């Protein structure tokens, strides 16, 4: 069966669900596709179709990111259902990087929980520009004052992490009731879709900048070659163009022989779109997650840089004790984690939780990098800091 061409009519926006485990992120994702498909066409996706990787089923928690698509009155959305469990924040960092805006799900029955806070912090550090709050499970709360209290707490929490808490849309709903076709609660999903259309501005796509795509996954397709997938960070890739694979290993040149999105073929892929890129003559083992595809000559791999870093305090889920020079955590860049060693500025012997500090980092492998690139610092499965590359040394 030949693949159908993707029709590019409405503006395309990337969003996703974030929030504490079991607050209803995946149920809400299913409810959005179900309610909007009835009104604007498209496909409804059931809860278990979204929550579908085998390891997710076994533990009843979402580990991998699931992509769904839907239409509103004015836009086409690609939606990522992000992992919610603390063990899997590693994936959250790569998933949340794919958002023009996030839908933060908080259960009205619980209010904000530790992961609610952690996800807001992560959204801040991976550069998610806008958050909309969906207060879920409101059908289970009869007390109006309690709902107002949760709403107030959410606004304060968002403001604490430099999001405009006072102006953030907060929709009170019930994803489960909306899935069950309850009209009152289905209308809340439409209210959410209006908030998406009106509150998340159409991003200024960086299509005019040189092409860059952080690689998330690599597949081998028999008879066609190697396909890499990811979200185009900037620029445009056209079929037939020469590109470079940069980072971790030696840089290699290749040619793009195909671009596809949601299993439909495109002549080109643009900034902000999740695509698969087919590479000519590239072997599956020559390319890996964490590298980037780039316009030749525009980005170089580096392993030694100066950075501005914030180290979380223990109340934010960070370390309880200081660390010293020579400390070796993991640094998460775009889609990958690389071990690195730190050097502290002269006169600084140690770094306390809660400190903001300039540090020099030596990575064990080079990463495609420019000034201004953001990263997370992790150890033992938890985020302990956030940083930005302020100056490349080598």
From Swiss-Prot:
Residues 60-64 are annotated as: G2. GTP binds at residues 19-26, 81-85, 136-139. Its EC number is 3.6.5.3. GTP hydrolase that promotes the GTP-dependent binding of aminoacyl-tRNA to the A-site of ribosomes during protein biosynthesis. Mg(2+) binds at residue 26. This is Elongation factor Tu. Keywords: Cytoplasm, Elongation factor, GTP-binding, Hydrolase, Magnesium, Metal-binding, Nucleotide-binding, Protein biosynthesis. It is found in: Cytoplasm. The gene is tuf. Its main location: cytoplasm. Residues 10-204 form the tr-type G domain. NCBIfam families: EF-Tu, PRK00049.1, PRK12735.1, PRK12736.1, small_GTP. Residues 174-176 are annotated as: G5. It comes from the Bacteria. Residues 19-26 are annotated as: G1. GO terms for cellular component: cytosol. It catalyses: GTP + H2O = GDP + phosphate + H(+). Monomer. Belongs to the TRAFAC class translation factor GTPase superfamily. Classic translation factor GTPase family. EF-Tu/EF-1A subfamily. GO terms for molecular function: GTP binding; GTPase activity; guanosine tetraphosphate binding; translation elongation factor activity. PANTHER family: ELONGATION FACTOR TU, MITOCHONDRIAL, ELONGATION FACTOR TU-RELATED. Residues 81-84 are annotated as: G3. The keyword Nuclease does not apply. InterPro entries: EF-Tu_GTP-bd, EF-Tu_GTPase, EFTu-like_2, EFTU_2, G_TR_CS, P-loop_NTPase, Small_GTP-bd, T_Tr_GTP-bd_dom. Residues 136-139 are annotated as: G4.
